From Swiss-Prot:
GO terms for biological process: glycine betaine biosynthetic process from choline. The modification Cysteine sulfenic acid (-SOH) is found at residue 286. InterPro entries: Ald_DH/histidinol_DH (IPR016161), Ald_DH_C (IPR016163), Ald_DH_CS_CYS (IPR016160), Ald_DH_CS_GLU (IPR029510), Ald_DH_N (IPR016162), Aldehyde_DH_dom (IPR015590), BADH (IPR011264). The gene is betB. It comes from Escherichia coli (strain ATCC 8739 / DSM 1576 / NBRC 3972 / NCIMB 8545 / WDCM 00012 / Crooks). Dimer of dimers. It catalyses: betaine aldehyde + NAD(+) + H2O = glycine betaine + NADH + 2 H(+). Its cofactor is K(+). This is Betaine aldehyde dehydrogenase. Involved in the biosynthesis of the osmoprotectant glycine betaine. Catalyzes the irreversible oxidation of betaine aldehyde to the corresponding acid. Keywords: Metal-binding, NAD, NADP, Oxidation, Oxidoreductase, Potassium. Belongs to the aldehyde dehydrogenase family. It is an enzyme of class 1 (oxidoreductase).
Length: 490
């Protein structure tokens, strides 16, 4: 693909130049080629976007529920019509295989938008009788202008997960995509405008998180920030949001999730789940089950089943329909993952497979890392304690149910957890003791629109998707009505 034209900001229904004068480049990580130069939003641009959003939000909130629902449904239709085009752009920008982006990224994002478009008429208040002459009623009102700050691993899906409930509740959103993968969020802005969204209701500000993101979190005109990213950045977002104007926050901050295989499990099923929990999207998924706990007596057999499945991974041309494994998103991220792999070797974990970059034709110029499995791991190893966010699985052994529950919970994270077992009683007994916000039994990774997703502990605050997220983008107003004569004590 030839280099794209310089990408601008999207404010008030159209593209506009950044006033900052700064730019950055976005690359294709499969081969290192520059895709585009992108303009970076500065403080003045954030001010412009907020003013635009305030204007648009008033128009948007004044529409009826059915009017807003119809506009969002039109956006869903356009997303699905342009699925292949958007998937190709997402593949170029992220490096993910087209077989994945064309069937997951836009599809699941559109599903969430359709879900919330249907829920708009369900946003309602309540009526509370006090006595014969008085009652209270409540209204759910939009917050106003909110901000979404996205991560680089699911660019358009995250933009939709954040914008769908915000817009459905009558808010306007200013979205800052990751500077690593900024392209599809701009296309989403075009689609919203084409669907009939009033100007300013969805503005996109590409830029560096430490600058553009900080300006958004500090801006007094923004009522809420929804952030997806790392723990350290999340703490800064939360501190800035509170210090500036006590903004509400929703945060999804990653994890180091356990996958527990019990001794009664079908090991073929367990191996299939472990592969999806570690190598889908080349391991760049927040919920990945990177700590795989296996009964000691099953370890050797489980390892052989994993090795057989690693042989079925197909890395290569990301547009080949047979490819199911792409490069990492950037060269700095590749280098960070390689540092973790080196640390795992240094601390005594045994490399079952992988452990290096992929080499040869089609790989040498890209950010490729081989699917890597460590075994003979211990809980104190760096690769077991810290989030790697790459194609690195750690296999650990255990002896008893109580032991594995304790060890699974021994982490600062609490995003996801899963178990594989044939015992229904054990499944629910164990899941109820695991400290994680998203749990799976005999499966892994699906996050449908109806399912609230979010973490315990350092893995986040609040939830995305589900009815509760729609409500979190509203504020409740209580009104008392008195029909009798008011009595004063004065």
């Amino acid at each position: 693909m030839s280099r794209m034209a310089e990408q601008q900001l999207y404010i008030h229904g159209g593209y506009t130049s950044a006033t900052s004068g700064r730019t950055f480049e976005t690359i294709n990580p499969a081969n290192g080629n520059v895709l585009a130069t992108v303009q970076a939003a500065g403080r003045e641009d954030v001010d412009r976007a907020v003013k635009s959003a305030q204007q648009g939000q008033k128009i948007w909130a004044s529409m009826t529920a059915m009017e807003r629902s119809r506009i969002l449904r039109r956006a869903v239709d356009i997303l699905r019509e342009r699925n292949d085009e958007l998937a190709k752009l997402e593949t170029l920008d992220t490096g993910k295989a087209y077989s994945e982006t064309s069937t997951v990224d836009i599809v699941t994002g559109a599903d969430v938008l359709e879900y919330y478009a249907g829920l708009i008429p369900a946003l309602e208040g309540s009526q509370i009788p006090l006595r014969e002459t008085s009652f209270v009623y409540t209204r759910r009102e939009p917050l106003g202008v909110v901000a979404g700050i996205g991560a680089w691993n699911y660019p358009i899906q995250i933009a939709l997960w954040k914008s769908a409930p915000a817009l459905a509740a009558g808010n306007a959103m200013i979205f800052k995509p990751s500077e690593v993968t900024p392209l599809t969020a701009l296309k989403l802005a075009e689609i919203y405008s084409e669907a009939g969204l009033p100007n300013g209701v969805f503005n996109v500000l590409p830029g560096v998180g430490a600058e553009t993101g900080q300006y958004l979190t500090e801006h007094p005109g923004i009522a809420k920030v929804s952030f997806t990213g790392g723990v350290a950045s999340g703490k800064k977002v939360m501190a800035n949001s509170a210090a500036s104007s006590l903004k509400e926050v929703t945060m999804e901050l990653g994890g180091k999730s356990p996958l527990i295989v019990f001794d009664d499990a079908d090991l073929d099923l367990a191996a299939d789940i472990a592969m999806m929990a570690n190598f889908f999207s080349s391991g760049q998924v927040c919920t990945n089950g990177t700590r795989v706990f296996v009964p000691a007596k099953c370890k050797a057999a489980f390892e052989q089943k994993i090795l057989a499945r690693v042989e079925r991974i197909r890395a290569g041309d990301v547009f080949d329909p047979q490819t199911n494994f792409g490069p990492l998103v950037s060269f700095p991220h590749r280098d960070n993952v390689l540092r973790y792999i080196a640390k795992g070797k240094e601390e005594g974990a045994r490399v079952l497979c992988g452990g290096d970059v992929l080499k040869g034709d089609g790989f040498d110029n890209g950010a490729w890392v081989a699917p890597t499995v460590f075994t003979d791991c211990s809980d104190d190893m760096t690769i077991v304690r810290e989030e790697i966010f790459g194609p690195v699985m750690s296999i650990l052994t255990y002896e008893s149910e109580d032991e594995v529950i304790r060890r699974a919970n021994d982490t600062d994270y609490g995003l996801a957890a899963g178990i594989v077992t044939a015992d229904l009683n054990r499944a629910h007994r164990v899941i109820h003791q695991l400290e994680a916000g998203i749990c799976w039994i005999n499966t892994w990774g699906e996050s449908p629109a109806e399912m609230p997703v979010g973490g315990y502990k350092h893995s986040g605050i609040g939830r995305e998707n589900g009815m509760m997220t729609l409500q979190s983008y509203t504020q409740v107003k209580s009104i008392q009505v008195e029909m009798a004569k008011f009595q004063s004590i004065f």
